[in-house]
Amino acid sequence: KLKKLYRGYLSFDDACDALTGRSTGKLLPTEFVLALLKLHIQELKGRTLFIDGLPRETDQVSYSLFFRDLIDYRDDPDMFILIDIPESVIDERIKYRVVCPECKNTRNIKLLITRRIEYDEKQGKYHLLCDSPRCKGGHRMLPKEGDNLGIVPIRSRLDKDEEILRKAFALHGIPKILLRNHVSVAESKKFFDDYEITPEYSFKREKGRIKVIEKPWTIKDDNGIKSVSLLSAPVVVALLKQLADILEI
């Protein structure tokens, strides 16, 4: 079915190879992405679609604008959801990311810890232990290969995302939801409570136990302004408020 739907300049076999062996720095051909989406959408009769990561190239903007016509959902409202996240936030979320080798649950040694932490005497390092109910539990969570480089391997993708965001923001005739992941430290106390701010965690050994130290996580935004990063809940609230306005509900 996928081969019948595919129309592109790259051979079907090469496109499949790009899918199975893709790296974080390279994007799949647009035509192949559309074929994959069409194939999956055929199985989702009459459902609302939320497509994450489209567009990823400037030529995909036009595809996304007319995508509802391609899938015959002509009467459904469409919109762009644009989120502004400082590169420093992305960088640290990648650098401190750890994954359970058993269930693939993801956490962050600095920003999203588990309930169980252990200290390795030989390494002189703290480790998170997986506590997912889907997992047998107790596995030491490990960093992914290349994560120590942060945003370096995906620099070209980030630059492209910035270009696309600016292009999408300039479009007329399509509603846009604008979200911010961060707010300056100076303004944060005026509009947000402490429980809405992303905490930063560190650890200390004290009387044979591991003490968790928590404080607000501060970063520099892309303009060099000292800022805090919001947790997901206040960002989702902002999304729902704007969505209700667009849908007039």
Residue ranges and their predicted role:
Residues T58-S62, S88-I94, I109-K110, E187-K190:
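Switch/connector loops and helix/strand junctions flanking conserved nucleotide-binding motifs
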Residues D131-I249:
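NTP-dependent small-molecule kinase module
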Residues G46, Y73-M79, Y96-R97, H172-I177:
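Short glycine-/polar-rich loops that comprise or flank the Walker A/P-loop
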Residues D69-Y73, L165:
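Substrate-engagement module of ASCE P-loop NTPases
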Residues K1-D69, G224-V228, V235, L239:
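ATP-dependent small-molecule kinase phosphotransfer cores
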Residues L54-V61, P77-F80, I85:
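Conserved Switch II/interswitch segment of TRAFAC-class P-loop GTPases
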Residues V89-S156, K160:
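Cys/His-rich short segments
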